[in-house]
């Protein structure tokens, strides 16, 4: 949303309580994103705690603590982006025997069945990943039970790609490098600057980085982060390889159309840049 408002000419300031923006991402990826946001004119204030918000009618005053300093800032509007929760308040569940989880979602099994027979829950209300395409897969799981064999379940979808539509997009699937190391994998890391991709020059957008973590023992892909033009499309190819349990060499040796962002996988997987 910050980039959307920024593109309309709005001055945007991001307040983040963490030491850096995108704390879940690997530092090299986060650094690239923050640099591009800053270049776009977005002001970022990390390690900031908001202490008070005062609505003055036409303006909003924020009182915040950054380090040892107390500050105030005035804005036209404030957008609160601190997460989401299932919207179940109007469903009347208190009149049923449908159980809830400790996080306030409808409790379901891996076939999305609730604690009441013949009642299923799909979408954000069941506490799963809150993405439109996951809700569509929820639908397929339930339809499979009603009209087919009933084999589909949430256990089948361990590989879920995600994309944040920044400029350029940031796409993820599986584990990033830090998570893979923490999980104890014998890890190979592959990286490629977007500047090396011919299609990026065609698009006149050479910002970003491709980064993939591979299990050195099995050669299976553990996860990928793509920060680049068309990353939201390319990530699906890597997700498919992970779902099919293909060794990374299958993507390295594929023949791709040219010029495309996906052909960069040929070069990306040539040589690991980190062995750990």
Which sequence ranges carry the predicted segments?
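Rossmann-like dinucleotide-binding cores of NAD(P)H-dependent redox enzymes
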Residues: 1-69, 129-136, 144-179
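Short, surface-exposed charged micro-motifs
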Residues: 52, 97, 111, 211-213
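Stable alpha-helical structural segments in soluble proteins, enriched in small hydrophobic residues
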Residues: 2, 135, 139-142, 146, ...
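FAD-site-proximal beta/loop scaffold in flavoenzymes
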Residues: 72-149
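General small-molecule cofactor/ligand-binding pocket signal
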Residues: 43-45, 73, 188-190
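Flexible, glycine-rich terminal cap/loop adjacent to redox cofactors
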Residues: 165-276
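Short acidic-glycine loop/turn motifs at beta-strand connectors
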Residues: 56, 102, 216-218
């Amino acid at each position: 949303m910050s980039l959307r408002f920024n593109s309309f000419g709005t001055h945007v300031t991001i307040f983040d309580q963490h030491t850096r923006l995108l704390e879940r991402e690997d530092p090299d990826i986060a650094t690239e994103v923050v640099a591009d946001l800053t270049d776009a004119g977005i002001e970022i204030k990390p390690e900031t705690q908001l202490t008070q918000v005062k609505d003055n009618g036409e303006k909003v005053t924020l009182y915040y603590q950054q380090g040892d300093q107390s500050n105030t800032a005035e804005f036209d509007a404030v957008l609160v982006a601190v997460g989401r929760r299932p919207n179940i308040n109007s469903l009347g569940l208190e009149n049923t025997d449908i159980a809830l989880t400790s996080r306030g979602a409808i409790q379901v099994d891996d076939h999305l069945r609730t604690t009441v027979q013949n009642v299923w829950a799909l979408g954000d209300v069941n506490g799963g990943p809150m993405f439109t395409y996951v809700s569509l897969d929820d639908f397929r799981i339930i339809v499979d039970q009603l009209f087919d064999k009933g084999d589909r379940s949430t256990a089948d979808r361990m590989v879920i790609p995600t994309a944040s539509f920044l400029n350029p997009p940031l796409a993820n699937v599986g584990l990033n490098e830090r998570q893979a190391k923490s999980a104890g994998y014998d890890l190979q890391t592959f990286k490629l600057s977007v500047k090396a991709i011919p299609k990026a020059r065609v698009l006149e957008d050479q910002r970003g980085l491709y980064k993939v973590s591979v299990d050195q023992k099995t050669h299976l892909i553990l996860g990928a982060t793509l920060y680049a033009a068309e990353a939201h499309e390319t990530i699906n190819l890597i997700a498919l390889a992970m779902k099919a349990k293909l060794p990374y060499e299958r993507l390295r040796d594929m023949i791709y159309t040219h010029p495309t962002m996906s052909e960069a996988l040929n070069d990306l997987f040539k040589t690991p840049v980190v062995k750990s």
